[in-house]
């Protein structure tokens, strides 16, 4: 239990409503205010969660008791809203993706450093026990030298998904949202980068095959990683029925297959019945972004995904888009 409660405010009450509920359930955190442009939505959330509400972001930022802001607005606004909060002296966490533009991520990182505040990105899969154990197994060399990583995400999103939301249609527009790689696929891009490390080269293709949208509903890419591994990506939102998501990790000594958040396969050449349970998760490891922010703000711990780490997936999906536009391989250095 923390020695004091840290005051939180949440901006945007779509997915942000779930994070506001998480704040209420987390020891050491206190939800003080929620903010949404829709007065009825903000009022209803405040009544449920027993906190204040406002339709004015500036008003919430003026509150000295609100130390941490969670940003859950359209993707193209993430860093602008984060920067506004950090300039007001607030610590910030942003829902995925960090933004849709690398330069905006860079600006937010600079502001966080200048203002001396915490900047984190909410990639919930980083807190999952299985994913932590896979990462530990890879770091321990259980698969040996990594050779290949394949990501397949084949989901179903109907036209109403893109036409709806608030503001209406924002998920379909390049200015406010990326497509299947930047929106749905970014969780898995982040896992790939976490598991294998930085990408060296990207050859990508993106297009819109089945929806009336500006953004893409399919992205494909071939990757090389700095550790020598190769990789491939398919991220699509027109697969009916949804075929889910899968990550296959192949090394010299064996293979791990991650399927929809579960362990599909763990086989090693020279060991029968290997188990990821050999890798223990520290008891004090944060279980979600709220616990992570409390640890970062109160004890100075580094969040699971800070600004620099959150930027990496934005750089990757933008490289896929750039390669698709130019028809050339993008070298990320």
In which residue ranges do the predicted regions lie?
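N-terminal Rossmann-like dinucleotide-binding module
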Residues: 1-48
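Contiguous beta-strand/loop segments that form the cofactor/metal-binding neighborhood of enzyme cores
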Residues: 183, 187-262, 287-302
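Predominantly a Rossmann-like dinucleotide-binding segment in NAD(P)-dependent oxidoreductases
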Residues: 125-211, 327
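C-terminal glycine/acidic-rich active-site capping loop/insertion
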Residues: 124, 245-312, 330-333
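C-terminal helix-rich "cap/oligomerization" subdomain common to oxidoreductases
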Residues: 1-2, 68-71, 226, 295-333
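Conserved SAM-binding strand-loop segment of SAM-dependent methyltransferases
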Residues: 50-59
């Amino acid at each position: 239990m923390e020695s004091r409660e840290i005051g939180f405010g949440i901006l945007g009450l779509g997915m942000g409503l779930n994070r506001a509920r998480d704040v209420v359930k987390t020891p050491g955190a206190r939800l003080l205010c929620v903010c949404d442009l829709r007065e009825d939505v903000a009022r209803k959330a405040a009544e449920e969660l027993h906190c204040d509400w406002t339709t004015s972001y500036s008003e919430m930022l003026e509150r000295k008791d609100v130390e941490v802001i969670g940003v859950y607005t359209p993707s193209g606004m993430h860093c602008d809203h984060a920067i506004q909060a950090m300039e007001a002296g607030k610590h910030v966490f942003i829902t995925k993706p960090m933004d849709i533009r690398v330069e905006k991520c860079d600006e937010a990182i600079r502001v966080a450093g200048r203002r001396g505040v915490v900047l984190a990105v909410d990639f919930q899969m980083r807190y999952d026990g299985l994913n932590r154990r896979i990462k530990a197994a890879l770091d321990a060399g259980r698969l040996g030298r990594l050779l290949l990583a394949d990501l397949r995400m084949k989901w179903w999103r109907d036209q109403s998904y893109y036409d709806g939301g608030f503001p209406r249609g924002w998920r379909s527009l390049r200015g406010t949202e990326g497509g299947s790689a930047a929106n749905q696929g970014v969780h898995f891009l982040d896992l790939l980068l976490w598991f294998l490390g930085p990408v060296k080269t990207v050859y990508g293709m993106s297009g819109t095959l089945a929806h009336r949208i500006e953004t893409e509903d399919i992205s494909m890419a071939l990757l090389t990683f700095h550790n020598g591994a190769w990789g491939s990506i398919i991220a699509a939102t027109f697969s009916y029925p949804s075929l889910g998501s899968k990550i296959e990790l192949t090394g010299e000594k064996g293979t791990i297959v991650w399927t929809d958040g579960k362990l599909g396969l763990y086989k090693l050449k020279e060991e029968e019945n290997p188990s990821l349970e050999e890798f223990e998760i520290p008891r004090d490891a944060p279980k979600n972004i709220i616990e992570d922010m409390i640890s970062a703000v109160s004890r100075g711990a580094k969040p699971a995904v800070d600004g620099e780490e959150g930027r990496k997936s934005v750089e990757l999906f933008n490289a896929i888009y750039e390669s698709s536009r130019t028809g050339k391989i993008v070298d990320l250095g």
